[in-house]
């Protein structure tokens, strides 16, 4: 609003809030180097074909699991070719808990960055395109079914109930690191800390579950953008052309 943005910036949503204030970067780089889904999630202006942002990083949900607990409960990790549904995840979580190998079968960060993927797996969304605008569809049957399954699992005690019920500030990541949780939905950024911190058991990352509409692991992320009024716009665009090549 103050017209004082840098020539090149990393942003999650500025370019969508003010699309006319940023360059269309699709004309400067070869967008075929990106997965189409990545462009849609990070870069696409939903009302036009303009690419105001080029993907830089993603918000990805990993499904961590306690290998030792799986072995104790007689469970095998799903494969890429035979991924679990969320119903199967809930069932496995109950088996883990019932086996006594862990206190809680599963846990999930109290964040939309985790839950919304469950919604997308079943073809749900909070809004959908309606002509040149959007309409709210938060109460669609897909969303209701997804939420009910999650609430039922949470109420059953297979998860640390208070984390999503709002009665606790506990970090579910600590539960997993302590060996109290069998399956943990969290950010991919937790992988390196877990490698450093977890020494009492072996852990892994399982393939993302699928729903009736497929899988979903990427909720959003950030990308690089260039303001149309940037002082050194040409230099910023040259950098992006150099940066977004296979070599670099």
Q: Across the structure, where does each feature detected by a protein language model lie?
A:
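Short helix-initiation/N-cap motifs at beta->coil->alpha
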Residues: 1, 83-88, 163-177
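Extracytoplasmic/periplasmic substrate-recognition and gating elements
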Residues: 49, 156-158, 195-248
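Short, solvent-exposed loop/beta-turn-alpha elements that line the ligand-binding surface or hinge
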Residues: 24-37, 79-82, 124-145, 196-197, ...
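Hinge/lid segment of periplasmic solute-binding proteins
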Residues: 8-62, 87-90, 118, 204-206
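Glycine-centered hinge/linker elements that transmit conformational signals in sensory
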Residues: 90-95, 132-165, 208
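Short glycine- and hydrophobic/aromatic-rich loop-to-beta-strand nucleating segment
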Residues: 62-65, 119, 224-226
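Bilobed periplasmic-binding protein-like "clamshell/Venus-flytrap" ligand-binding domains
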Residues: 52-53, 97-110, 245-248
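Conserved N-terminal structural module of periplasmic/extracytoplasmic solute-binding proteins
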Residues: 1-16, 30-34, 77-78, 188, ...
């Amino acid at each position: 609003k103050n017209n004082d943005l840098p020539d090149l910036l990393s942003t999650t949503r500025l370019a969508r809030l003010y699309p006319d204030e940023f360059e269309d970067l699709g004309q400067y780089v070869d967008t075929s180097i990106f997965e189409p889904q990545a462009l849609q999630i990070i870069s696409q202006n939903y009302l036009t074909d303009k690419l105001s942002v080029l993907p830089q990083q993603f918000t990805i949900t990993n499904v961590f699991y306690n290998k030792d607990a799986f072995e104790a409960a007689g469970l095998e990790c799903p494969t890429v070719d035979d991924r679990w549904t969320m119903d199967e995840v809930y069932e496995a979580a109950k088996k883990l808990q019932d086996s006594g190998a862990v206190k809680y079968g599963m846990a999930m960060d109290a964040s939309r960055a985790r839950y919304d993927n469950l919604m997308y797996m079943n073809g749900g969304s909070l809004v959908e395109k309606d002509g040149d605008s959007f309409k709210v569809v938060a109460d669609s049957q897909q969303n209701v079914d997804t939420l009910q399954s999650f609430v039922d699992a949470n109420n059953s005690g297979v998860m640390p109930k208070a984390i999503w019920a709002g009665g606790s500030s506990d970090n579910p990541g600590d539960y997993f690191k302590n060996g109290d949780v069998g399956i943990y939905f969290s950010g991919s950024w937790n992988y390196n800390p877990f490698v450093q911190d977890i020494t009492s058991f072996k852990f892994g990352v399982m393939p993302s579950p699928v729903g009736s509409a497929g899988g979903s692991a990427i909720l959003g992320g950030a990308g690089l953008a260039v303001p149309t009024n940037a002082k050194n716009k040409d230099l910023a665009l040259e950098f992006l052309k150099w940066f977004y090549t296979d070599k670099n």
